[in-house]
Amino acid sequence: MNKQFPNYIKYILSNIGFLFVYLFFFRLIFFFFIANFESVSIEEIQTAFSYGIRFDLKLVILSYFPLSLLILSTNYLFFKKKVFRKIAITYHILLYLLLTIVYLIDIGYYNYLFSRLDASSLRFLSNLKISSQLVVETYPVYKGLFALIFLFVFIRFISIKLFDKIARKDVIFLSKKMKAVYFICTFLLLSFGVYGSITHYPLRWSEAFFSKNNSVNQFALNPVLNFFDTYNFRKDGVNNELTKAYFPIIADYLGLSKDSISFKREVTFDSIHKQKPNLVIVMLESLGTVALGHEGNVANATKNIDQIIKESTYFENFYVHKPGTAASVFSSITGLPDIDTKETASRNLRVIDQKIIFDQFDGYEKLYLLGGSANWANIRGVFKSNIKNLKIYEEGSYEVENRADVWGIDDYDLFNESDKIFKNLHSSKKPFVAYVQTATNHRPFSVPQNKESYKPLVEGDIDKTTLKESGFISLAQLNALRYLDFNVKTFLNKAKESGYYDNTIFAFFGDHNTSMNETESFKKEFDLGFQLHHVPFFIHAPKYLKPKKISTIAKLADLFPTLATVAKSDYTNFTLGSNALDTLKTNSFGFLYLKIKGEPGIGLIQNNFYFTKTIQNNFKSLYKISDKDNIDVSNMYPDIVSSMDSLITSYYHSTKYLYYNNKK
């Protein structure tokens, strides 16, 4: 029977088999070296493998379908003409190289964000120079290029050998009827592989999200298919009808008139400070609440920040809207969540023009300071287009510059240079509002071997059990946070020496949590998927605020309304943020922009409940945060589901409305 099997069919199936084995090899690499399955059952792993293999087979067949159709159409002629031989060899080389590159990018992407490659990754192409440099400084790119050259030679050799071997075999002459049978059967077999299911419904990406453990779900996905499956979720637009319908909900929360859609609230103060206080907002790169020793982390990486928190007003339930530095910078400045599906809102030229509170500090010098270039993610546009007379200090602006990595000068030098600028302004009796963006607590974790009293830990300084319990993925990650902690303390000490400390309101917040493993203290947040959003926010201003802990929920959009209130600086609020120090507001909430089973979604944290729903399919879930089990309790609390659904929908559509209707 095998001898009667057409050579061109053998050629198709052989190549599909080889490519499948090749992709399965990558899946094994991901399983053994990338994924974290310490607390996962064998059954879940088996199920993930089952889905993963089916996704891989689907990709293999789809990848090979164009050449398969050509072979089936030409059958024996395919091995007789040299042009087809060149097409086959070139096709295989390009296919293997392209898939290899994508899979390698996927591994790096997962290490960075704990997520498989998807369409949102296209945002990194908007600043290809920085993204490329980060990759080069973090991964062995040049060694990889040599490996790709070797792969090119190897695939070319194998492709030639296989083609020539099949071509030399005796030709079995078939009738037109049998050729048609083989064509149809092969086509149906390949189609079934793409369909991937014996049920009425084809294999879909959502099936990979079968587990409550996100690591398992991510492992089941195929990066190439996942990229294209998420591509359609990049659409944007305003639904004026829904905005109008749900406006009364957000109007009640913000204290607005319901007569017309307007978010304008004028805030004035009966008394003002004798001397205008300075404001310094420090964005703490990749710092989540879970990493704080103050919150029980056993690594003791933030002993300086922990002490500062005790001397500050600390918001223990503070949430950023969307994980990502660009998203948090945009939200903190504009007072609007970043709900852009494709990239980040900062990159959307149609939405960066906003009426913001930062611009309303009359009589203040306004500054934005960072170690690298302000061109990344169009952040320069967000600041420059909205803040009059803003001065940007970036790489190339400072007196002393020792470039550390792709992010420019490190945090130590950034704080040193910032202190010089603030000291000069203080000496000139010019009040200032400054936004300082740190970066060293970010890959590639370029911490120095010695900086004053700081020294990185080495193997043996911390036992593996403690490192594991702390949730840190690596010693390098831990050292980067310790360096940030050291620099924050050093900066405040310099502020005292320079004379502007007493009259300055310092606000520190994390832009998002970094990728960390599960910890005992924050297991619930890890399981429900909002640990990345929970970050510290504390206002250090001993002259203006007494130290205290605030347990009510606050969100990133509240940053500037809160700070303007502490400074007693009159402002007009056009944003969705509120004063987080308002003790009368007991129904506060956190608004999160999420991915739910691969689909864009939104989440709301309020009164011990966590409500989520997908944007397109409107799939809803409700969880009680204090419960031990992660069980959807929607059926038990229908009134709460209805209330939270209305609030989150109103907030979401109000955000989109303000994107395009809050221009100066």
How would you label these PLM feature ranges?
Residues 52, 56, 134, 157, ...:
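Residues that form generic nucleotide/phosphate-binding pockets
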